[in-house]
Amino acid sequence: MEIKEEGASEEGQHFLPTAQANDPGDCQFTSIQKTPNEPQLEFILACKDLVAPVRDRKLNTLVQISVIHPVEQSLTRYSSTEIVEGTRDPLFLTGVTFPSEYPIYEETKIKLTVYDVKDKSHDTVRTSVLPEHKDPPPEVGRSFLGYASFKVGELLKSKEQLLVLSLRTSDGGKVVGTIEVSVVKMGEIEDGEADHITTDVQGQKCALVCECTAPESVSGKDNLPFLNSVLKNPVCKLYRFPTSDNKWMRIREQMSESILSFHIPKELISLHIKEDLCRNQEIKELGELSPHWDNLRKNVLTHCDQMVNMYQDILTELSKETGSSFKSSSSKGEKTLEFVPINLHLQRMQVHSPHLKDALYDVITVGAPAAHFQGFKNGGLRKLLHRFETERRNTGYQFIYYSPENTAKAKEVLSNINQLQPLIATHADLLLNSASQHSPDSLKNSLKMLSEKTELFVHAFKDQLVRSALLALYTARPGGILKKPPSPKSSTEESSPQDQPPVMRGQDSIPHHSDYDEEEWDRVWANVGKSLNCIIAMVDKLIERDGGSEGSGGNNDGEKEPSLTDAIPSHPREDWYEQLYPLILTLKDCMGEVVNRAKQSLTFVLLQELAYSLPQCLMLTLRRDIVFSQALAGLVCGFIIKLQTSLYDPGFLQQLHTVGLIVQYEGLLSTYSDEIGMLEDMAVGISDLKKVAFKIIEAKSNDVLPVITGRREHYVVEVKLPARMFESLPLQIKEGQLLHVYPVLFNVGINEQQTLAERFGDVSLQESINQENFELLQEYYKIFMEKMPPDYISHFQEQNDLKALLENLLQNIQSKKRKNVEIMWLAATICRKLNGIRFTCCKSAKDRTSMSVTLEQCSILRDEHQLHKDFFIRALDCMRREGCRIENVLKNIKCRKYAFNMLQLMAFPKYYRPPEGTYGKADT
């Protein structure tokens, strides 16, 4: 017997009027007792002794489930089972589930209508509300067999929560069979005898036993309110599939939107505006420049101000979005939604097996991070950035070329300056406060903190880039002579001794000026260290004279420069504050001089990047910001969900703070036409996630939405946890240790465009991406094996042969095989075994993504949970016809059809083809 399903379910919660769900009159109805955050009601169906309308006809049966609300008395089509072919005793694998927020009561009536499907390719169920007892008009491809109805309270109060109802014709007269309705409670032990149901499966009898063992908690249910603050609008589906030993396993499939789809882009855009306003102000404060450079500065500021205004407008528009928490695929080209990820959802499968632990499997599905509004006529970021840097390197005399590494370094030093200067000032004031209190211990502690921060400050200026930037800025002042465009030294030059003879300087590209004193910066910079040494020496002297038995941590410095301590005159002990105050003032003055010079010179470096090819470089920055915003929203969503589900797993938490997390992206984009540009955008966006770190903090209020800090080169995402959850974390994480992620992307095009690329085009982009990211994955595995404790590694290796999987993955990447989906299966398996975060992406995360995640789910059921081999294809069809992914299609394009045609599907790998009747023409 072959099972196929009709693409006909509708999630009723999307179609009931809002007022109905919150009707004041609802209080007179009896609510269903339920577990918080669990579905209110789940049941499964089976029919027996169905009467065919035509003698000897083999029935192809489905059941349509409708809901009659006790107030409205209107019928809402809610969902459907799959189609079971060739039997009068169909047993349906697709169940019915009502999520926790659905307005259902004991008085709610459920209507079950049984159809005989004659033409699956035309069979659909349209959403509509009909008066009670009115049958829908005849639909193409099906014929009505019979119906039955019951109240929810009758089912819940029945013996063993099982109803056997007679199916009657539309006039209520003739009985055409029976239908069994059985309540499902996932994870509970079923009392009494197991329910034996026999069904004909491809010519053999298969006894399916419905029994479950006591489960272990999949994830702490205490965590669910926290997760629900991030996830919204869940769509739930229920299935039962037989195992290889003919027992039932139960599967709950869930798909949820995330409010982070809009929250993260708004956070990020706000940071961009703040960063760009600060940069613009620093450019304005560069001081007097020669006419050439001043004109460049004015031009840069004009364009930068326009860019800031654009970001502010986008932020204003995003703040108006208060409805849906996801961006549909049909909106991917909208300018105001550019920063928002496309169709971001959590795809979750919860499995309850007879003999295995309950398990959760999560995949984040999202459209490939790409700048759709900008278009792909000239390619994506990977190509555009390479071309831009090549052209900038060969620019004319009017600009100074700084490599991307040096530009990033300038931004890093500027950021460090802005962070460290106020910190040092604070610690200096604390030192004075300790002196006024005459507390030796407090004085030593304050000095230790001041020394550490000041040493970091001094170290920030050791880079040769600062020296060359100072000289470049000097030549740009009025009267400066620009004999040759200055450029920073390479890393090898930076590491060379700085005491080379001056004659060697003529060989580099740094300009010279007869009045420029190259040693002046060294003196200014060194004065900070000397000022600190004076403070250390004074503290040592004060504590020593006070009779302290221990010196401060700066004794070594005092020994190196004994003249400092010798030069300090003796003072009475009550004058500690007065003796330290002028030294602190000197330190602050020296720092101010260093900061002023360094900020101006490094800002001049940033001016060079902006001055070249305006507005192209700003448009590239915009494109990169857009792509990164989409990628980051998905990453933060995935990280929070992974943290919630693994919060009480000590091994995972140790891996989190010791190694970091692997984040694996599965790409399904072709290397043909516009999708090449999408893949180029996606590759850069995912690579940019390396500059993101996470920090877990305790939530001080009910607001647990993440907060982002930092700048374009380095972001920290602060994830807030309720106190009870926060206390369960290891000390290292609670103390604020930064948690790192290792993003990797593996792409295999599977559609008909990839066929064209493989035969007539170029697949080198895909090959390069896969090879590069394999090396990153291998590096992560190496770090994982080195840093995790030996006892953990020993147990881990017993359970997983990752080395063999990695070797197999490398062989497949190097094999040059067309549409080698084995690459994706292996990468996904490795990611799961390494406790990683899984993503699946295609252009809009709707069609190809749906085929991939459903295949992955069924493969997991087969490989990890003993799904009966004869039911693999049927399970796959169930999930594709009546599962969450067909609901995703409906949410995106208001049509229950995957956007494939027969010609396209001929090019798809076998297991990536949807079942008949679920695909066709759809406007996307």
UniProtKB/Swiss-Prot annotation:
GO terms, molecular function: inositol-1,3,4-trisphosphate 4-phosphatase activity; inositol-3,4-bisphosphate 4-phosphatase activity; phosphatidylinositol-3,4-bisphosphate 4-phosphatase activity
Tissue expression profile of the protein: Widely expressed with highest levels occurring in the skeletal muscle and heart.
Record-listed E.C. numbers: 3.1.3.66
Substitution effect: D847E: Significantly reduces phosphotyrosine phosphatase activity. Not able to dephosphorylate phosphatidylinositol(3,4)P2 but retains approximately 35% of activity towards Inosotol(1,3,4)P3
Record field: transmembrane: none
Basic and acidic residues bias locations: 1-13
GO cellular component, one term: cytosol
Outcome when changing K843M: Increased phosphotyrosine phosphatase activity. Does not alter lipid phosphatase activity for the substrate phosphatidylinositol(3,4)P2, but reduced hydrolysis of inositol(1,3,4)P3 by about 70%
Role this protein plays: Catalyzes the hydrolysis of the 4-position phosphate of phosphatidylinositol 3,4-bisphosphate, inositol 1,3,4-trisphosphate and inositol 3,4-trisphosphate. Plays a role in the late stages of macropinocytosis by dephosphorylating phosphatidylinositol 3,4-bisphosphate in membrane ruffles. The lipid phosphatase activity is critical for tumor suppressor function. Antagonizes the PI3K-AKT/PKB signaling pathway by dephosphorylating phosphoinositides and thereby modulating cell cycle progression and cell survival.
Stated name of the protein: Inositol polyphosphate 4-phosphatase type II
Biological source species: Homo sapiens
Lineage: Eukaryota, Metazoa, Chordata, Craniata, Vertebrata
Annotated gene: INPP4B
